[in-house]
Amino acid sequence: MATRGGGAAGRTYELMVLGASGFTGQFVVQELARVAAGDEFRSSGLRWAVAGRNRSKLEDVLRRAAEALGMPQLKSEIDIIICDVGDPSSLDAMCKQTTAVLSCVGPYRFYGEPVVKACVENGTHCIDISGEPKYLEGMYFKYNSQAADKGVYIIGSCGFDSVPADLGVLFTRDNLKGTLTAIESFLSFHSGPEGTCIHDGTWQSAIYGFSDQDGLRKLRKQIGHKPLPIIGAKQKRRGTVFYSDELKQYSIPFLGSDVSVVKRTQRYLYENLEEAPVQYSAYTTVGGIASVVKLIFAGLLFLLFAKFSFGRSLLIKYPKFFSFGYFTKEGPTQKQMNDSSFTMMMFGEGYSEGQDPQQGKPNVKICTQVKGPEAGYVATPIAMVQVAVTLLKERSSLPQRGGVYTPGGAFSKTKLIERLNQNGIQFTVITRPEA
């Protein structure tokens, strides 16, 4: 069994951004360039490159990053590697040159696995920003043992899905004196006068994910995990649409990967570190009754069309129409991103020190908050890059074995939360029990 041996020393690059010319990839390039020029790498430097199919598009990404950051040297100093996800030999050649790949090649259900496979086979770590539970859990099922043997870390969901939620649960747990047994999170998005939108790549992932729910159920049956033990009182699930007294808004269950990722983290911590698992539910606020009506109508359309091939093709072709403008082929403008932010409130409950969680009702509560800039294309690159930096800088604090990990599973013993705090994604305690 290999331990912490992947990402062989002496490779040309430490980090490689694959899919750098994609909509999200371009912002990952900008964030990585900013961090590489910062204090942490001022003396040692950071060797990194960009990779993709089209040289001219990659050159354009570097040019725009150079202009945005006032760093003209990027255009000449950052190497470009030509690589096609559909060409295994080009993936192998790329992986052999770098310690870790930052994979921005979504939808991951179509393009993610070849990258993971090449990374595992070539002893290269892989970080992605997928929010697709079937892909994430499928990579665990297929590659966890191989990655462990190679000493390689494959770490998924390292963007807005699901770093704030996964690390937020750990932050909340660590700030409660006693045993945290359950958390509800409420995610709110904030935008400026021009509103906001999301690039349709995320929309496509949602469409395909919904249409393949049976596949996810079958995969989980194949994995065959036993249910996690419930510590303390069993958490009650909310309705499909409900009014949140905590946030004074209507809310719905969060449809991303957060619940899947957090549950996998809690399983890893319970089975490997004997830490008490935390029950977790995730919700999104939607505002007042008018927003609820609009959401229900859009949701019914989505449910109807996503079931059939022809309907899915219409949803993909006309994202702006079917999502009421929330998803577009162009993505948000820079002004929209500058004016947008997110807040995730976490309401936890548990048992005080000395109190048996199996006896009686929870007797302590805690409220924490994770907040940051625009979620998809500002916070996501921040999270992804800080995950990569932590992987490079704190290898000894990662799990002893390689494998396919969640962010919380990989980084629970590192300073990742501290790094995120320093770079714009802030974790704070709002209220805690009296000592």
What is each model feature region?
Residues 42-75:
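Glycine-rich phosphate-binding loop and adjoining beta1-alpha1-beta2 segment
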Residues 10-38:
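N-terminal Rossmann NAD(P)H-binding glycine-rich loop of SDR-like oxidoreductase domains
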Residues 103, 107, 116-136:
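ADP-ribose/adenylate-binding Rossmann-like module
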Residues 2-12, 174-435:
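C-terminal catalytic/substrate-binding lobe primarily of soluble NAD(P)-dependent oxidoreductases
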Residues 112, 130-152:
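Rossmann-fold NAD(P)-binding glycine/threonine-rich loop
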